[in-house]
Amino acid sequence: MNLSRRSWMTGALGLGLAPASSLPAVTEPYPRSGKALRVGLAAYSFRNHFEWSRGKKNPKFEAGEKAMDMPGFIEYCARLGLDGAELTSYFFPPDCEASYFTDCRRIAHVNGVQISGTAVGNNFSHPKDAPERVEQIAHVKQWIDYASLMGAPHIRVFAGAHPKGVSPEDAEQNAIDALAETAVYAAEKGVFLGIENHDSITTADRLLRIVRGVDSPWVGVNLDSGNFIADDVYAEMTASAPYAVNVQLKTEIKIKDSKEKAPADLERVVKILKDTGYAGYVVLEFEEETDPYEHVPPILEKLQKWCG
C-alpha cells in the first residue's frame, strides 16, 4: 500500500491523534503526543578514530592507536549515559555480514542504548535515466535493510549536489522522485528517511519543499543545526523542526557570505526544539578537528541537562 503522508494524517485525525482541524493542501508537521528529547552521539564525531572509512582503511587513523569500531562506539555511548547511538555508515567494515548488524543491535540492547539511526552519503539529484541514480537508490535501499537489522528507526539521506548539466529545479525534482521511490521500500521496513539540509539545501524553504513534494509519512527532515546558510539560521531551524524525524546538533553555525563559522548557541537550539514540539533524538555530531574524547563529554553533559 502506498500510503501518502497526507492520508496518514487524515487517519491519525480520525483516531484523535492529530489536532481536530482541516488539513491544508500541503503536508502537515508530524502530530506528536510526547515531548521527550533523547540525547545521542553520532559516530561521525570519532571519524578519525575508526579503522575503516567509506570502505577503505581510514587515512586519518593513526597506527598504534586502539581503533574505534561500532560495538566499541555503542559501549562508549552507554558509559556516557546516552539514550542513543547514531552509527554512521561510512565507518562500518567493508562487506559486513548480517551478523555484524544484528550484533550491534544486541550490544546496544544489553547496554541500554538505542541505535537511533544511521547515515548515508548518497546523491539523489541524478536524472532518471542516469545509471548513477539506479546505483544511489540501490545503495540507500541496502542501508534500509541494514537499519532494519539493527533496529534503527531512521536513516539520514541527502538530496545531493547538482550533477553537471542539471539545473537546480531539475535536480530538486529528481531528488523528490528518488526519495518517493525509496520511501516505499523504507515504509515496508519501518524505517524513516530524514532528508538533511546539506549540499544544495541551505534553507528551510527548499528543505520543506522537498519533504512536501515526497508526501510520505516515512520521510521527514533530518535537521542539521550547522548547515543552514541564511541571515537568521535559528529562524530556519524553527521552521524546519516541526517536520523533523531526527536532529543532528553541531557546535558551530555557518555565516552567510563567509567561509567562517561561529559558535552555536546550543541551549537556544534545544529551546527551539522544545518550543516547536519536537520529540525524538538530539544527536551531537562533533565536527571540530579537536580530540573528541576530551571535548565531546562536556558538551553531552550540558545537552543532557538542557534536554531533560
For the regions a protein language model found, what residue spans apply to each?
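N-terminal pre-domain/capping segments
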Residues: N2-L149, D170, D177, S216, ...
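Acidic/histidine-rich catalytic cores of soluble enzymes
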Residues: S53, G84-A85, I176-I272
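A structural motif
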Residues: L82, A152, A244, Y278-A279
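Acidic-and-aromatic substrate-binding clefts and catalytic sites of carbohydrate-active enzymes
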Residues: T88-Y100, F124-K128, P163-S167, H198-A204, ...
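Helix C-cap/helix->beta junction micro-motif
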Residues: V110-N111, M150, E188-K189, P217, ...
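Active-site groove signature of glycoside hydrolases
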Residues: A147-V166, K189, G194-H198
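Conserved active-site loop/cleft motifs that coordinate metal ions or position small ligands
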Residues: G280-E287
